[in-house]
Amino acid sequence: MLTAQDKQKIIKENQLAEGDTGSPEVQVALLTARINDLQGHFETHKKDNHSRRGLLRLVSQRRKLLDYLHDKDVERYRSLIKKLNIRR
């Protein structure tokens, strides 16, 4: 589970301007952190299909934001996936 300090750190690292919390970069970074956190949960709870559905929803939401960013600005998209080590 991400703490408030973890979220603030992620926001600071990815924001485009001061106070920016809604840009695609920030949203994708936060979703990536939540997804990575959930993957550890599934190593110990392999049959937790209820949470797995939530994970798939998060992955889908991140994919949509990445597609949006790719359409708007390819360079920002490429730098973000390289920074977050996301496969594409």
UniProtKB/Swiss-Prot annotation:
InterPro entries: Ribosomal_uS15, Ribosomal_uS15_bac-type, uS15_NS1_RNA-bd_sf
One GO term of the biological process aspect: translation
UniProt keyword terms in alphabetical order: Ribonucleoprotein, Ribosomal protein, RNA-binding, rRNA-binding
Molecular-function GO terms, alphabetical: rRNA binding; structural constituent of ribosome
Any single Gene Ontology cellular-component annotation: cytosolic small ribosomal subunit
Subunit structure and binding partners: Part of the 30S ribosomal subunit. Forms a bridge to the 50S subunit in the 70S ribosome, contacting the 23S rRNA.
Function: One of the primary rRNA binding proteins, it binds directly to 16S rRNA where it helps nucleate assembly of the platform of the 30S subunit by binding and bridging several RNA helices of the 16S rRNA.
Family designation: Belongs to the universal ribosomal protein uS15 family.
Name of the molecule in the record: Small ribosomal subunit protein uS15
The species this protein was found in: Francisella tularensis subsp. novicida (strain U112)
